[in-house]
């Protein structure tokens, strides 16, 4: 991960040393991945899903400096998930108390076929400190998606012969995530950060239409149930939440009425 393998020359060098497969830097674009493939006769592995480090190729020294825990040795203290203030050169406050270094999670599920066509032969899913449910759901989703591609594209085949029967329908939105980004796959984009919170917002389940004395009128994309815990971003962009006491049609009665802004506030169900 931290070897910063982003040029054909470096991949050729590693292959010459005896490496049989090379993990490419996650910052590479699709065109750069394909260029490495065309120049090098070695299997390539790329990141497709999971948490992203704000440091280039995960080479971070801040955790060690501030907390005595080396991120480069697997003891990251999650410095980039903290709140920061941003001031200009004159000391004027631009942003206060925002998670300015917190990246969204990578999700290239919609780009698997493009990655295969670019020469990728192995997929890497980040899983540090993830639980069994996360691993099961995410790997099952990618396995299912790959199998769909292989059925249409006989020129591709599985590397193993094992078969798995799923008793559930995988859904990436139901596992922990900070919002999703494709990162730099098609070049630099401005939507890679999660400034409001480093926590998992969960799956979107509805939109607030009106707030009355003791209940909230919602337009739901998912059914609500008594006891649900719901989250939303308040007018200051801070993450808030409440517990549902009961549900009557499109009316939600919270156990304790929160201050919910009405202007198309999205409700999410945390994972």
Sequence positions of predicted segments:
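Active-site pocket-lining/capping segments in soluble small-molecule metabolic enzymes
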Residues: 1-5, 9, 23-122, 129-154, ...
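Conserved small/polar residues in nucleotide/adenosyl-binding loops
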Residues: 265-271
């Amino acid at each position: 991960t931290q070897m910063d393998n982003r040029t054909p020359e470096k991949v050729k060098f590693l292959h010459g040393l005896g490496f049989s497969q090379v993990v490419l830097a996650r910052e590479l674009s699709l065109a750069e991945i394909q260029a490495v493939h065309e120049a090098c006769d070695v299997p390539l592995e790329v990141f497709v899903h999971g948490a992203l480090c704000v440091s280039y190729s995960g080479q971070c020294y801040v955790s060690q400096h501030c907390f005595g825990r080396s991120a480069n040795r697997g003891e990251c203290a999650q410095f980039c998930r903290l709140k920061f203030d941003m001031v200009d050169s004159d000391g004027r406050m631009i942003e206060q108390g925002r998670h300015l270094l917190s990246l969204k999670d990578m999700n290239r599920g919609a780009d698997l076929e493009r990655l295969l066509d670019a020469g990728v032969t192995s997929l890497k899913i980040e899983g540090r400190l993830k639980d069994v449910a996360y691993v099961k759901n995410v790997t099952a989703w990618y396995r299912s998606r790959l199998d769909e591609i292989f059925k249409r594209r006989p020129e591709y085949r599985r590397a193993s012969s094992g078969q798995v029967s799923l008793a559930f329908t995988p859904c990436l939105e139901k596992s922990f995530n900070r919002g999703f980004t494709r990162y730099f796959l098609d070049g630099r984009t401005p939507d890679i950060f999660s400034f409001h919170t480093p926590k998992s917002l969960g799956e979107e389940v509805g939109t607030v239409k009106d707030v009355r004395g003791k209940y909230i009128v919602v337009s739901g994309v998912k059914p609500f149930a008594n006891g649900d815990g719901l989250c939303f971003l308040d007018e200051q962009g801070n993450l808030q939440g409440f517990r549902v006491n009961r549900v009557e049609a499109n009316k939600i009665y919270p156990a304790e009425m929160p201050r919910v802004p009405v202007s198309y506030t999205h409700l999410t169900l945390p994972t």
